[in-house]
């Protein structure tokens, strides 16, 4: 609903159709069109009212329960055929793996049943036929390693096990009692730490196997504190791999990756026919050692027909108060279902409170009691049985609201939305904080067996946008606008009639439909499935965890193959290291081609070329102690030492080589593949393989992480700096007049992994040819697989400063540019108002595309003049910034934070929350007032005619971006005098505020419409302008007509967007410029009508 600060659905006019019954559905391909355009069928529906009444459901359905009779059979999963575990294998794609504690049943060739509590892994998935599966995996226990103390032998194992058991039992008193021994086994084995090259090979380690995963933390702590071992005293034990999640540990050992296909061989599993613990169609038990894991290659790359459900709710809030589940009812829940691989939803359902008119293409089910509505949706979820649940802000609003509302109404059977029978869906608060995104508070709703993909959370994590409302992101990615209905208006629609409730249901359906389209368009599901497969973690981890778990999974897999162990490192924020090199830019406007050469996968390539890894790191002085020859190790630019691959091949280089070679294979398959679904999968796979190598480097540099290593990360950036500088030297020494080239080449800029070269040629084709030649020449001077590649040519090129430049980009063809490329400029940034981005973009287009710098200057001066004369629409002046933490946590006063606090005092329900982006404008105030005190809500400004501080926008928003662009062209001193001084800045228009200040104590007096002199009567003109009264009246009427025409056009535009040319516009989308225009024109119309009333009623002569 709009309460989630996003748009309600829009619609339009559908094609006329023959009459259908209430439960009949249109062809799926018509659904979007029907949603877009519904109103033209109103007349036809009224003509067919009698026939419609015959097809309405019986009265008993309103207020009744949602029974299986109300469910379309097409919504249900196919009925599984008889499965004989003794002769038929079970093959399914697993989507989620978790664990629980229970008792183990007897299994073929397995240990006898035990009453002790044991961890049981649970894999949820889907077969090729679409059957849902829950596989209970038995026999796997948690374990970790620790180095054996000096003198420790096999005779000490039983004593240590007894002592550790006793210590854990004492530690667990007062908590959950253990049903058996805490330590199942302690074994001696040979392993080696992965941290550092020691030269002595494997050493004795102890593998400690525990009964339950929750015992890992106390066991690790007690061993670190010291455990008595008879004959050896009380040694302290350093833990290895004790901080690995139980699910990751199992997946590594069983060679299972996220979302891959599992096979249970015939005769190795048992099907649960009775006493099922879940709602899945097929529920089985199997030993972990009997599970066959298929690597996601070839035929095993396919994705099962997953069922995706997208839903949205609407609530009836009170005026001016954001809906609260304790008081405000849920009035509609709309759901759409999609099978992965099919083009259209197979399910469209609107559950409404109170009767609702039919909607073509959707099934409408109405209820008189809210309790029945909620229970009906819960029953529907269990019947439809989705694998993936999506929507927009469902994580922080829809799901928590539904569960809290059901609790308030005591709908006890509602909150069982997962797949485990009798397991309640709970809400818990979660907080995430990082340097990149700040702090985000959110809620987590448990729904075991189903994957939640909240599209809002996906977009916040993956994309940098100016606004994250559903309307804004739909327009950005889908090119669609939609209506935004304020939460207070929703109540009025609900309290209307069947037609207004149908209009609300159409909005709600669109709100459920757009996240589904975003999920498909952005390939969110496919990309995450492939990332889970590449990195080896469960799908849910990608949506709820950070980057490090993906690298840990890959590291553990490679380490296990080589008998290496990952230590547990206690991390604290340590010293930082020098970042990448940026060659000082030669600022200016280049009207010659500039070739860009780029290092392919620079940091991963450096790690592979120089064998940089935990396992190859030498401690200071270790090379001499180990007797290593000079050609057996390297010294990095930062002074750190690593052994070469001839001595030991590093784990990280092996992981990176596997990722890069797998990407080459995936791209080769993608080029040959013709099936659209397989192309999606392969494209998602190559994208995951492209992103993953860079996270390996980031993992080593994370100072607060699982395994930070400053020596690796600083060595990588050290080599990178060295290579950029060497590239500059090589290019500038080879491409010279002395060597027979047309000009002396010059590197005008270099940043991290790329250099921009001016070869002195006049054509793009020549620059491309020299760029390719230079890339091959430079690559020959670096060890494999480091490779410099020709990437593109900029012509012309505007180099402003470090990390700020723009140019026309040529990549493949020399006769036509691909696009205008901007980096670091306000054209692509989102921390300023749209006016800045639009003006910068239009100026750059005139400079680069039109090659007309003078025209760009004239255009910029015109816009500045319009700004100072108050001719710029307020939508162009809105600044948005994210509220990343509470007001008290900011070091200084911030404009958007102070406004959020003021809005909270005005209306707590509509005030922004943590994580929201706050829109504001800067208004005029007394001289010396701080900017943060002048921020105001744009709608409040329009309603109260508050003046805009145009000088602030000129000096603080426009000035610096414009000077950055024009100084390289006009010169530093001249740019400011030309753009920010002169005749175009001398005329200013200031609005008079209706509120605040001295206006509260003043009395307004009328002025003559003709000459503006003060008059002491209520008329329109003074006695001197009386002869011109008719002329002035006609002029004002003409102005009124122009305003009416403008308002009519804007109103019609909004009606088209909402899909109805017959209903009032109720949209309040703050992301839409037309909304602000409509509000402004409406107010101007009211003022103009009041002005005309001063002329008095027309006299008899007018008739």
Curated annotation (Swiss-Prot):
Residues reported in the UniProt entry to bind [4Fe-4S] cluster? 1054, 1057, 1067, 1072
User: Segment Disordered: which positions?
Assistant: 1-27
Q: Which residue spans match zinc fingers labelled CysA-type?
A: 1008-1025
> Reaction(s) catalyzed by this protein?
DNA(n) + a 2'-deoxyribonucleoside 5'-triphosphate = DNA(n+1) + diphosphate
What is this protein called in UniProt?
A: DNA polymerase delta catalytic subunit
Q: How is the cofactor bound?
A: Binds 1 [4Fe-4S] cluster.
Q: Which domain of life is it from?
A: Eukaryota
- GO cellular component terms given for this protein: chromosome, telomeric region; delta DNA polymerase complex; nucleotide-excision repair complex; nucleus
Localization, per the record, is: Nucleus
Positions of short motif CysB motif = 1054-1072
Q: Which gene encodes it?
A: Pold1
More info: In eukaryotes there are five DNA polymerases: alpha, beta, gamma, delta, and epsilon which are responsible for different reactions of DNA synthesis.
State the Gene Ontology terms under molecular function: 3'-5' exonuclease activity; 3'-5'-DNA exonuclease activity; 4 iron, 4 sulfur cluster binding; chromatin binding; damaged DNA binding; DNA binding; DNA-directed DNA polymerase activity; enzyme binding
Protein source organism: Rattus norvegicus (Rat)
